[in-house]
């Protein structure tokens, strides 16, 4: 099957449906199909794997998926709480002082106030998004089995990580370079 378009574009989902192909969006969606009956039969017929070996490999891949996402989520939370949050607060402090000085001199501070409010709201939202991820990681330990754990990460943890990332990305655009704690493209 050849598709020379962008497989990440929404058009691909439509094209896959037209061609009768599955559109498995996450590893948690795709990995369980490794042990589909037709795949097991193929592996056994060609003496590659037994059914037990196929299921074992699938289980290992699902466990690895959850473990890698745990590490990524913990890293993200640490970066948000220990690096971004304090850096943006430091920048906010400077912005507030500058706005106050401008106001005392009769200057216009409307843009300063808007930026302060936006950064403050985004920083607070990011902080609470990090807390949400921490709670989800505790909840993830309750998932029974590798497939249930992978499904939990795909359905709950990844969307929470995407929310945190959106706040951090927005703050990166609005924070002075000297305060941002990580290299940027700018």
What are these model-predicted stretches?
Residues 1-186:
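C-terminal amphipathic alpha-helical interaction region
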């Amino acid at each position: 099957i050849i598709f020379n378009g962008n497989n990440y574009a929404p058009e691909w989902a439509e094209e896959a449906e037209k061609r009768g192909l599955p559109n498995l969006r996450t590893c948690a969606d795709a990995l369980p199909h490794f042990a589909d009956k037709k795949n097991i039969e193929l592996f056994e017929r060609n003496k590659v794997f037994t059914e037990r070996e196929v299921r074992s490999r699938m289980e290992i891949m699902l466990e690895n998926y959850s473990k890698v996402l745990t590490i990524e989520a913990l890293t993200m939370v640490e970066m948000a709480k220990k690096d971004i949050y304090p850096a943006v607060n430091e920048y906010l402090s400077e912005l507030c002082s500058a706005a106050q000085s401008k106001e005392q001199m009769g200057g216009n501070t409307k843009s300063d106030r808007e930026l302060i409010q936006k950064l403050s709201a985004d920083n607070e939202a990011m902080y609470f998004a990090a807390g949400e991820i921490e709670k989800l990681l505790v909840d993830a330990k309750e998932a029974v089995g590798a497939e249930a754990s992978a499904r939990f990460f795909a359905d709950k943890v990844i969307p929470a990580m995407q929310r945190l990332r959106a706040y951090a990305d927005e703050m990166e655009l609005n924070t002075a370079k000297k305060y941002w704690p990580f290299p940027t493209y700018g």
